[in-house]
Amino acid sequence: MARDREHRAEREDRDNTFVDKLVHINRVAKVVKGGRRFGFAALVIVGDQKGRVGFGHGKAREVPEAIRKATESAKRALIRVPLREGRTLHHDVHGHHGAGKVILRAAPAGTGIIAGGPMRAVFETLGVHDVVAKSFGSSNPYNMVRATFDALTNQDSPRSVAARRGLKVSQLQSRRRVEDAEATD
């Protein structure tokens, strides 16, 4: 039993090479009777650059320990995001968390990652090469990351939309061409 678990963990580590990015470190203080006890909080983004990404938060008395805890937390919270042609999003999407709002837009090849701060780290670890993103409201890294993840969880591939509607992918795309032709007339 234990041997199976170890073998599975080894296989997962070998198959999944993750890239991690440290987004934010915060020094926090706990006031106790004898003064202040300082600690550190870390926010880390982890991804495989093939459509899986997660974020984690870790706290500890030392910075490396906080980063390690955050990385482990991020690996446990991975989500899969469908990518178009392995380089961009399928459609434009909005997300929010608290007072932070983000707009993510699919972009043509060669655009690059046009996003600020924590959002850029999310896209780099996710494996997106072309995207335009804008954040509004809160510039707190935690809120920006959570708003970005909220938007990414609302991302649907044409295949999943077609399955939900009981259609074929080609029928979805033919409807889109008809609507585009009517709009230009």
Curated annotation (Swiss-Prot):
Keywords: Ribonucleoprotein, Ribosomal protein, RNA-binding, rRNA-binding. It holds the Pfam family Ribosomal_S5_C. One of its GO terms (biological process) is translation. GO terms for cellular component: small ribosomal subunit. The keyword RNA-binding applies. InterPro entries: Ribosomal_Su5_D2-typ_SF, Ribosomal_uS5, Ribosomal_uS5_bac-type, Ribosomal_uS5_C, Ribosomal_uS5_N, Ribosomal_uS5_N_CS, Ribsml_uS5_D2-typ_fold_subgr. Residues 18-81 form the S5 DRBM domain. GO terms for molecular function: rRNA binding; structural constituent of ribosome. The keyword NADP does not apply. Gene3D superfamilies: 3.30.160.20, 3.30.230.10. With S4 and S12 plays an important role in translational accuracy. Part of the 30S ribosomal subunit. Contacts proteins S4 and S8. Belongs to the universal ribosomal protein uS5 family. The N-terminal domain interacts with the head of the 30S subunit; the C-terminal domain interacts with the body and contacts protein S4. The interaction surface between S4 and S5 is involved in control of translational fidelity. This is Small ribosomal subunit protein uS5. It comes from Azorhizobium caulinodans (strain ATCC 43989 / DSM 5975 / JCM 20966 / LMG 6465 / NBRC 14845 / NCIMB 13405 / ORS 571).
